[in-house]
Regions:
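GST-like domain detector, emphasizing the conserved glutathione-binding G-site
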Residues: 1-133, 248-280
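Acidic carboxylate-rich catalytic motifs and surrounding loops in phosphoryl-/glycosyl-chemistry enzymes
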Residues: 41-47, 180-182, 231
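A short, terminal or domain-edge coil/loop segment
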Residues: 58-61, 90-105, 141-154, 227-245, ...
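Short, hydrophobic secondary-structure boundary micro-motifs
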Residues: 87-91, 177-180, 205, 227
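Long, positively charged, glycine-interspersed low-complexity recognition regions
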Residues: 196-280
Length: 280
C-alpha cells in the first residue's frame, strides 16, 4: 500500500466543475501534499449516497486500494498514518488543535457572513439538478428565502475584511502557517477562501489586501491547484465613503507583534505612548 500512486476522490462540484466544498478543497491539497495522483469522481449536492454506494451522504470521501475513508480530518490523519514516508500533513496533537482553532475562528469571522452574502450565487452556480435541493435545504437552515438573505450584501461585505486582521498579522511574520513550508493548517485556511472564490460573483477583499500574497501562493501550489477556471477573483472590493478601513495600514506595534530585543526595538511604541499621554 505504501507504494500506491493514485487515490480516488469523490468531489462536490458546481456546474462549472469547480469544487465548492471547503472540506473537499482541503482534501485535494492534502493529497497533493502527499504526492498522490488523484482520480476525481465528479458530482454535485444530490446523489452522493448513490455515488458512494450507500457509504456516505457527505463529501469528501476517498478510496485507497479498496479502502474507503470518510471526512476531511479523518482522511488527513489516515494519509499521515498510512504514508509516514511522505511529507507530513499534521505535525502533532498541538498542531491539530491550533489548526482547528484557526479554522473555527475563520468560519465564524469570514464564512458565516460571506455565506449570507453569496447564498444566491451558491445556489445559482450549482448544477441545475441541485437547485431545488440547495434552495430548500439552505432556506430551512437560514429561516428565510435565499434572495432575502443575500439582499443588501453591498452594505455588509466591507465589514468583513477588518475582522481578518489577526490572520494578516500571523502571515506578516511567517511565509506559511506551517512555517517555511505549507502544511495542513494552510490547507484548511486556504479552503475557506477557495470556497469563497467558487461562489463570490462580487469580490470580498480589496485589491491591495495583504492576504493576497499568501492566497496567490497558496492557489498556485501543486501546479495551480486552486486556479480552476470556474473560480471568481477574491480581490477588487470597492469601498464607499463611510466604509471601515479594510486592514491596518501600518504594522502593529507592541508585544503581540514584535520581540523585545532592547530599547531600540520598543522605541516606536514608547514614542507613540508618550505622544498619547502628552495629548491628554
Amino acid at each position: 500500500m505504501a507504494n500506491a500512486k493514485r487515490i480516488t476522490l469523490y468531489d462536490l462540484q458546481l456546474a462549472s466543475g469547480c469544487t465548492i466544498s471547503p472540506f473537499v478543497w482541503a482534501t485535494k491539497y492534502a493529497l497533493a501534499h502527499k504526492g498522490f495522483e488523484v482520480d476525481i469522481v465528479p458530482g454535485g449536492f444530490t446523489g452522493i449516497l448513490e455515488r458512494t454506494g450507500g457509504r456516505s451522504e457527505r463529501l469528501p470521501v476517498i478510496v485507497d486500494e479498496g479502502k474507503w475513508v470518510l471526512d476531511s480530518w479523518l482522511i488527513a490523519e489516515y494519509l499521515d498514518a498510512t504514508y509516514p514516508d511522505r511529507p507530513t500533513l499534521i505535525g502533532g496533537p498541538s498542531v491539530k488543535t491550533l489548526t482547528k482553532f484557526l479554522e473555527g475562528w475563520l468560519w465564524r469571522t469570514a464564512v458565516t457572513p460571506w455565506f449570507g452574502c453569496y447564498i444566491k450565487d451558491y445556489r445559482d452556480l450549482s448544477l441545475p439538478r441541485d437547485h431545488a435541493y440547495v434552495t430548500s435545504s439552505r432556506e430551512a437552515m437560514l429561516g428565510r428565502k435565499i434572495e432575502d438573505v443575500q439582499a443588501g450584501r453591498e452594505d455588509r461585505l466591507p465589514h468583513v475584511p477588518p475582522t481578518l486582521e489577526p490572520f494578516r498579522q500571523i502571515l506578516r511574520e511567517s511565509k506559511w502557517l506551517g512555517g517555511d513550508r505549507p502544511d495542513y493548517a494552510d490547507y484548511r485556511a486556504l479552503a475557506v477562501f477557495l470556497w469563497t472564490g467558487s461562489v463570490a460573483t462580487t469580490p470580498p477583499l480589496t485589491a491591495d489586501d495583504p492576504l493576497r500574497d499568501w492566497l496567490d501562493r497558496g492557489f498556485d501550489l501543486y501546479g495551480g491547484l486552486g486556479r480552476h477556471p470556474g473560480m471568481h477573483t477574491l480581490f477588487g472590493l470597492k469601498l464607499r465613503p463611510g466604509d471601515p478601513e479594510p486592514f491596518t495600514k501600518e504594522p502593529a506595534r507592541g508585544g503581540l507583534a514584535s520581540r523585545n530585543t532592547g530599547p531600540a526595538s520598543t522605541r516606536a511604541e514608547t514614542e507613540m505612548l508618550t505622544r498619547a499621554r502628552a495629548a491628554h
